[in-house]
Amino acid sequence: MDGSRVQLWAKTDPFLLGALQMPPPAKFSMHYLRKMASYVRTRATEGCYPRLYWAMWRHIACGKLQIVEETAWLYFETFLSVFERSVAQSLDWAEVASTCPSSEKYEEIKSQLSVDTLKFILFLYIQQINKISLRAPMIESEWPSPRSRSPTPDFVAQSSIYNKVWDDYSHYNFIHNHLTYILELLMEPKQLSIVTQSSHCILISAEVVNALGFLIEGTVDKNRAVNHFLDLAVWQPVQIKSGFIETSGAFSFQKLQAWIKECLVINPFGITACIKSGTKLSWAQQVDGLNKRAKVACNTYKVPHTHRMVVMSQISKQTLAKSSKTLVDARVKIHRCSDCYIYLLSPLRSVTVEKCQNCTIILGPVQTVLHIQMCYNVKIIAVCQRLSLLSTTNCTFHILTPTRPLFYCGNQGAVLAPFHIRYSMLEDHMAQTGLATVPNSWDRPFLFSTESNNSNIWRLMPPEDFFTFVVPFEMEGDTTEIPGGLPPAYSNSVQQRQQKIHTWQKTVKDAGLTREQRKQFQAVVEMKFNEWLSKTENRHQLDSLVS
């Protein structure tokens, strides 16, 4: 570290991957979370502190915060899988969970899971970023809009929420405006009573400052290296400003708060910087007759490996296919694409697909969250840690996932189907992202909205409508089959269809056609095939593959 000025910023991942895109439960307010923070500290010997075990969180969530057990597990599992488990630990957990002989044994194993208590409390608190303000203007219209309808309460909520998790300015404002509350949440219970009277006397432990590193990181060398928040706070040249007292190993509450606010800046590795000053990639073709140009930008060549980001926008009427180091471990946003096929065959950190229509998107394994919002008639094919949907219409999802697909508000006509592709590097990419073939919960969605009784939200794809999907590219690798195979009903449907084809081929072979008759028959088959290509719009995909 040199003598340059310290810069601090809000991390992207806690908001992008951790903030569930629904207004938080009423009892996730400061009042109740402060009570929870005091409660867990006074019950350290009961599995509450410094690690909070699932059984105790379930007790607190269901008994005191009055949320149902399914929702309590959703928050716990999200934090654990996204922020605490390594790739190896994820694979180990998949093996343990998939081999449990009974539900009782599974619950017993779950009771052994734990999370960092202070960081988990911060995780619960940042759900407030999606709290709905009735004074906030509705500036976004529904998109796409295949039909006219009056805004519902859930749609008003979604309009206010969907852009915040990617917005660097929202993250900055949240930390800046809520910093006092965040610090208070992490304090010892006995300190809370005096914080408003004499904050200059209060000391914050290094443990609390370390927990703040869940939300904040920074640099002192103009973004060449990213440092942990605690390392910056105890750095000798800034100790006077940060309030660090070497003799006690603690920090002055007042000085620490002032120093953070003074050093806080917009995330230099966020989406704003990526779009403004990132590298423009020539992956997409420019199609004549379109009003807006296709754009692909990344920050891969300018940022540390853990901060990679790729943004794709306005891809239309083409096939875009990439397997690239640029995509590895990147946070990907696919925005306003239409009438196209997109293949991103690399291991990805997270993916958001937003405001797209009439697209087929095939993804490499997504280590954390695959989120689809405000899309119409989109087909998604992927292996992911979690699938979440917000305001989608007539979309199809071929998914392999260890967690239940999460349906927020505004979804209609979603079709869930088994994962059905392979490419040569797929299993290697799954291993890199900590994703296994079991357990697989693709067909058990969790409806996390007020519309849970609406039968039009989702359905399973009937086996007779199911077809396998071929990735039309060659790569080096060992995967030769669909990972995990197909569920029996879908496998049987594919086999029956193949048997009909074999029977038809044998019938043609045994028909004793002359050479002229075979030529005529071939011409008819080709004509019908071309008619089918045009009718199903597969002609466009073939033409774009050739070009």
From Swiss-Prot:
Pfam families: TBCC. Residues 304-435 form the C-CAP/cofactor C-like domain. GO terms for biological process: maintenance of centrosome location; maintenance of Golgi location. May play a role in the regulation of centrosome and Golgi apparatus positioning. InterPro entries: C-CAP_CF_C-like, CAP/MinC_C, CAP_C_sf, CARP_motif, TBCC1, Tubulin-bd_cofactor_C_dom. One of its GO terms (cellular component) is spindle pole centrosome. Gene3D superfamilies: 2.160.20.70. Disulfide bonds: none annotated. It comes from Xenopus laevis (African clawed frog). It is found in: Cytoplasm, Cytoskeleton, Microtubule organizing center, Centrosome; Cytoplasm, Cytoskeleton, Spindle pole. The gene is tbccd1. Keywords: Cytoplasm, Cytoskeleton. This is TBCC domain-containing protein 1. Belongs to the TBCC family. Its main location: cytoplasm.
